[in-house]
A protein has these predicted regions:
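Conserved Rossmann-fold NAD(P)-dependent oxidoreductase catalytic core, especially the SDR/UDP-sugar
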Residues: 1-16, 24
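Conserved loop-to-helix N-cap of the C-terminal "lid" that shapes the substrate pocket in Rossmann-like
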Residues: 32, 67, 74-82, 98, ...
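Conserved beta-loop-beta element that borders a ligand/cofactor-binding pocket
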Residues: 18-42
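Mid/C-terminal beta-alpha module of Rossmann-like enzyme folds, strongest
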Residues: 84-147, 152-154, 158, 172, ...
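Glycine-rich "substrate-gating" loop/helix at the edge of Rossmann-like oxidoreductase active sites
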Residues: 9, 36-46, 66-79, 103-105
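A conserved pocket-lining segment of Rossmann-fold NAD(P)-dependent short-chain dehydrogenase/reductase
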Residues: 54-76, 84
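Generic structural signal for alpha-helix termini and adjacent loop/cap motifs
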Residues: 58, 91-92, 177-181
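Short, surface-exposed alpha-helical segments at coil->helix boundaries
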Residues: 16-19, 49, 110, 149
């Protein structure tokens, strides 16, 4: 899905190489911003949609593979990320510095989805399964045992950055946008409830 949306993303994509090239050029004044997974209104990946659809469809249980449930990665709400970029761009102190932009703390995928579900007043339960027992359409590529955890302490302490929108409100706004702007095309295999029910039937 990432490559379908971002066609420039391939196996040669490497941001670190770009950072090193910029830092190695004494003629170029630089500041490096490391951005998170950005969510919110306008998200081309519709990150909230699979959970919202299952809840709306009346699913009482939502499955996560064990490795994905525990995975942690940096997230940021679109307005907060834009504000952080503006703070850096207008600061004389930012030259020659590297800043991570992300929410604090970095929640596990299970904790994150639980916060979204709570905002939706969904009263079902999350069921965490070993990867080998998880339906194939729910498995994510990559190595979920490798967390991607960043700290935004530097931009907060050095430049005084603060989130403009608190996390509960960011989730509420994103849910509202997703409900009003569902994806134009759905992959039915992504919502194979028969396979999910079969996996649930084998849970002790």
């Amino acid at each position: 899905m990432l490559q379908n949306t971002f066609t420039w993303l391939d196996e040669h994509y490497d941001k670190i190489a770009v950072e090193e090239a910029i830092q190695g050029d004494p003629a170029v004044p630089w500041t490096i911003l490391r951005l998170p997974m950005v969510y919110g209104p306008g998200d081309p990946l519709h990150r909230f949609f699979p959970l919202l659809k299952r809840a709306t469809d009346g699913r009482s249980s939502i499955l996560l593979s064990e490795d994905l449930a525990g995975w942690r990665g940096p997230r940021g709400y679109v307005e907060n990320v834009a504000h952080a970029i503006a703070v850096v761009a207008t600061s004389d102190q930012a030259a020659g510095r590297i800043y991570n932009i992300c929410e604090e703390p970095s929640l596990s995928e299970l904790a994150w989805q639980s916060k979204i579900a709570k905002q939706m007043n969904w009263h079902g339960k999350f069921v965490v399964l070993p990867r080998g027992q998880t339906p194939k359409h729910l498995l994510q590529p990559g190595n979920a045992a490798q967390h991607v955890v960043a700290s935004s302490e530097r931009i907060r302490t050095e430049l005084g950055y603060e989130d403009l929108v608190e996390i509960e409100e960011t989730i509420r706004r994103t849910i509202a946008w997703e409900q009003q702007n569902p994806p134009s095309a759905l992959n039915p295999q992504q919502f194979d409830y028969g396979a999910e029910d079969a996996a649930l039937a084998n849970v002790p």
